[in-house]
């Protein structure tokens, strides 16, 4: 396992539409391992492969919270070629952030419940229902696979401010 660099806004790669994974290979398994290590190190609860410059339809997630003793039992989840096949009319609002848009958070409204179809690391196609933060995170990460960022759900004014801030920061950093 190794840490991978997380690409940061305004990097244009974040707007790429990721390609489907044809088969779960040792290279895909290595990518998943690296994504988990990178996500945990950041720290974050979700990561799309495109965020580590791999335009493949792979996401990793772990919504585990510390227990009363302060210990966190990890609950790693992998979704290969995920797609939302159903969503509720009911909406919910969560404050979202993104490892590719560091230290910026805004409330985003999304369907409260979704049904997702995906392939697991064993190559088995599965379907799963998700609600609450789980549903929000799945939608956020699948958006990444389609070149969509959570700031795209904000007003034009807020979105433009965020883009300006991160574009200036990238110029200062010499990118």
From Swiss-Prot:
<dbReference type="InterPro" id="IPR023635">
    <property type="entry name" value="Peptide_deformylase"/>
</dbReference>
<dbReference type="InterPro" id="IPR036821">
    <property type="entry name" value="Peptide_deformylase_sf"/>
</dbReference>
<comment type="function">
    <text>Removes the formyl group from the N-terminal Met of newly synthesized proteins. Requires at least a dipeptide for an efficient rate of reaction. N-terminal L-methionine is a prerequisite for activity but the enzyme has broad specificity at other positions.</text>
</comment>
<feature type="binding site">
    <location>
        <position position="144"/>
    </location>
    <ligand>
        <name>Fe cation</name>
    </ligand>
</feature>
<feature type="binding site">
    <location>
        <position position="140"/>
    </location>
    <ligand>
        <name>Fe cation</name>
    </ligand>
</feature>
<keyword id="KW-0408">Iron</keyword>
<dbReference type="Pfam" id="PF01327">
    <property type="entry name" value="Pep_deformylase"/>
</dbReference>
<keyword id="KW-0378">Hydrolase</keyword>
<feature type="binding site">
    <location>
        <position position="98"/>
    </location>
    <ligand>
        <name>Fe cation</name>
    </ligand>
</feature>
<keyword id="KW-0479">Metal-binding</keyword>
<dbReference type="GO" id="GO:0042586">
    <property type="term" value="F:peptide deformylase activity"/>
</dbReference>
<feature type="active site">
    <location>
        <position position="141"/>
    </location>
</feature>
<comment type="similarity">
    <text>Belongs to the polypeptide deformylase family.</text>
</comment>
<dbReference type="GO" id="GO:0046872">
    <property type="term" value="F:metal ion binding"/>
</dbReference>
<protein>
    <recommendedName>
        <fullName>Peptide deformylase</fullName>
        <ecNumber>3.5.1.88</ecNumber>
    </recommendedName>
</protein>
<keyword id="KW-0648">Protein biosynthesis</keyword>
<dbReference type="GO" id="GO:0043686">
    <property type="term" value="P:co-translational protein modification"/>
</dbReference>
<dbReference type="GO" id="GO:0006412">
    <property type="term" value="P:translation"/>
</dbReference>
